Amino acid sequence: MSKEETQEIRQVQKEEEDNAEQEEGEVEEEEDKKSENESEEEVELEESKEKKLKSGNEVNKSSIKRRRSLYAGFDEKQDLFRPEFRFNNHDPVKEKMWALMDTYLKRDKLSVQKSIVQHIEYTLSKTRFEINSQYLFQGTALSVRDRLLEQWNDTQIFIKINNPKKVYYLSIEFLLGRLLQNALVCLDLEKCYKDALNEFGIKIEEIYEEENDPALGNGGLGRLAACYIDSMATLNLPAWGYGIRYDYGIFRQAIQNYEQKEFPDYWLTKGNPWEIMRLDTQFKVRFYGYCRDSSKNGKSCREWVGGEEVIAVAYDTAVPGFNTFNCNTLRLWKSFPSEEFDFEDFNRGDFQSALSDKDQASYITSVLYPNDNSLSGKELRLKQEYFFSSASVQNVVNEFSKLNLPWSDFPKYNTLQLNDTHPTLALVELMRILLDEKGLDYGEAFYIVQKTFNYTNHTVLPEALEKWGVDIFERLLPRHLEIIYLINYFFMEEVK
């Protein structure tokens, strides 16, 4: 801590605190100085390790540098985290950035308070005269998210280094509940934030009440999915949840004239401080069109062309585990148009047509379980299920491709769990990718799919099992219907 910062803190304490608070502040300053001294010793230790690395005593190709941090209470585990890479091609620019990222954020009360008010002023762009309980919630949540991101990023690097088998949990629902209190408990920071907010004149329970419940699920199916991804994080399993980022969720209930009225539950009215939009993670999802014979790398294949495309963009939320540094990912997909604006239609004065692609794309991720009593409703629901199944499978395939391993190893590194019937098109989508894009034979592709997927069945009642007419399926997903016929043909041949 610099002399200028120390003088500013002491000046504020003289003006706003009594003698007891001043003494407490001085104790905190001494602890900060002690932590800084320890940090300087750690840097010296790391510099000596770096010299050894340059002299060739370490692994030639690359090595991992793990720094100890200021993360209180878990010192014996710190060597597992804050990993960084060292390569032969020394880059002083990256070295400087890495040096500034070598420790965790502080967890003392004063640091937490600074973090909250800085987010209110600089992230939310609010003045000191505009602060209310909602802005305090937003600032608190963003402050907690900062500390989650440290563990989240470290977990992803740790997984990338060790390359274990990964679990992907596909569910059309995730009934998460409010996230702030769960995050604080998992980070062991609830008491610290409670004390910090008390000095702001607000109870932490009031902050909890400001959070909107994410409208991403309806009942037991979604709650089970949320419990699974939470438990897998606690069990230190490398897992991802895949679902849909709904704009309105299911519905908001109101009683008018003794009758139930349903209204959109726009849970995003106050924003969502937990999610991170991943503009670098997006995939094209096709609907309609037709299939034709083609060839790839001198090998005949089928090609799906025409129709319309939308873009699936990822929104990530950190899922912390309890009493562990492991922090997994819930990845939700939102639909965007491949061409958002038709300038020719707009210039002709046809403003509705100019934005029609944008509207059509937004319908897919608007509402959980759209009414399927009409033909258009059935089509929208099938679109919705294929949309998130396709984006999820493409994401998994894309990550595996980076390993440069044979496709026969795909089940050794990936397992996909399907939560009920809604994501079952993921099986056919993986078959399509392996057959049409990767050039595998039917036998190879089907073996990989069999070894990769698992399925949870929630009921055997016929009214709860989904059925789709061949006509609507063929119009919307022509190539997938061909693959289903192909699977059925080989199955019938096998059981003859």
Question: Where are the language model's segments positioned?
Answer:
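N-terminal acidic, proline/glycine-rich, low-complexity intrinsically disordered segments
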Residues: M1-E16
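A conserved ligand/cofactor-binding region detector
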Residues: E24, E28-E31, E38-K496
